[in-house]
Regions:
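Charged interaction scaffolds used for protein-protein
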Residues: 1-12, 17, 36-54, 65-105
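Short capping micro-motif at the N-terminus of alpha-helices
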Residues: 20-22
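Short, surface-exposed, low-complexity cationic segments
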Residues: 24-41
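A residue-level signal for conserved active-site and pocket-lining positions in enzyme catalytic cores
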Residues: 60
Length: 105
């Protein structure tokens, strides 16, 4: 069961229920992948609500690795979501919300 206080979520991807979390290391990985200089810039990028398929692969991959899975982005790109593209978007959105919260919070 995911620990929401630590920013963990659970999602079905690649045929298994998996835990994802954006640890400090995972966030640093995303800063580098997106060319953002700090966490505020990363949060602002996510707040825009526009994500490419490549963005989703980076976010989901970082979340899986943050939870301890040894997966590459190439492996993540081949993992199926039972809800297709919409499922990937929901997973990334839930992970970002668990990490950064919402504007209402």
């Amino acid at each position: 069961m995911p620990n929401r206080h630590r920013g963990e979520i659970e999602a079905e991807i690649g045929g298994f229920r998996r835990t994802l979390v954006l640890t400090l290391g995972a966030l640093a990985e995303l800063e580098a992948a997106f060319g953002e200089g700090d966490l505020l810039a990363l949060a602002e990028r996510f707040a825009k609500g526009r994500m490419s398929a490549r963005d989703l692969v980076h976010i989901i991959g970082a979340g899986l690795r943050g939870a301890g899975e040894s997966v590459t982005d190439e492996e993540v790109a081949r993992m199926a979501s039972p809800d297709g593209a919409e499922g990937y978007v929901r997973i990334a959105a839930a992970l970002i919300e668990a990490t950064f919260g919402t504007a209402d919070a």
